[in-house]
Amino acid sequence: TDFSPFSGMGNLRELRLLSPSRLQSCRGVGSLERLTLLEMSRASKLDTLVGIEELSCLQRLELHSCKKIASIVPVASLSHLTSFYCCDCGRIDSIQPLATSTDLEEFLFHESTHVLDGDLFPLLGLPSLRVAVFAARAHYSHTPEEIDAALSG
């Protein structure tokens, strides 16, 4: 139900979990202190990212089809994060927590991922951001073309 089965793997640098049917939380993931890449795909019971903020070395976070996650607030504490993929994850409350992610270079939130508050302004304040991929939605503050132009200008 959490990351406790991995507790003795502190030297692990990359972890890809494909269809972890029992995973409900990120509790215990902090024991993977050298982890630089974490990918979770089709984690149908995972409903919170709380605990992920303990991964001080994490550079790449990929969430694919993790549809119960509504908040990305814990991601804000990942100071070395350069890539964040949140693809086909349903409804995300806001991307405002990313406003402090100064090292973030890539942010993909496409397919069914839908930012409920529609505020994409935080992307414009990220000094390292080079790539942002998302679907155009009527209530979003910016179109993909507007964000691309701002990032390349």
What are these regions (language model features)?
Residues T1-D93, P97-G153:
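Concave beta-strand-loop units of leucine-rich repeat
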